[in-house]
Swiss-Prot record:
Signal peptide: none annotated. One of its GO terms (biological process) is translation. Keywords: Chloroplast, Plastid, Ribonucleoprotein, Ribosomal protein. This is Small ribosomal subunit protein uS15c. It comes from Solanum tuberosum (Potato).
Length: 87
């Protein structure tokens, strides 16, 4: 599973404040909230929380893409998320 391999790599580095670790945590929260919202379609507070977390992850990914493009590409491939649109 992708989750276990990413966890082992991140915990080996012991950088819990790193951008990669934060994006990883946000991705897990997003996946949990998405599965919750599939069951509870009218849970508007959870929808709002999901949008906030998506925005935070998007900002962190934009920061990482600007600072280190190679780490950004590796991270989005490991987490199996789409690349952000550039303007």
């Amino acid at each position: 599973m992708v989750k276990n391999s990413v966890i082992s790599v991140i915990f080996q580095k012991e950088k819990k404040g790193s951008v990669e670790f934060q994006v990883f945590n946000f991705t897990n929260k997003i996946r949990r909230l998405t599965s919750h919202l599939e069951l509870h379609k009218k849970d508007y507070l959870s929808q709002r929380g999901l949008k906030k977390i998506l925005g935070k992850r998007q900002r962190l990914l934009a920061y990482l893409a600007k600072k280190n493009r190679v780490r950004y590409k590796e991270l989005i491939n490991q987490l199996d998320i789409r690349e952000t649109k550039t303007r």
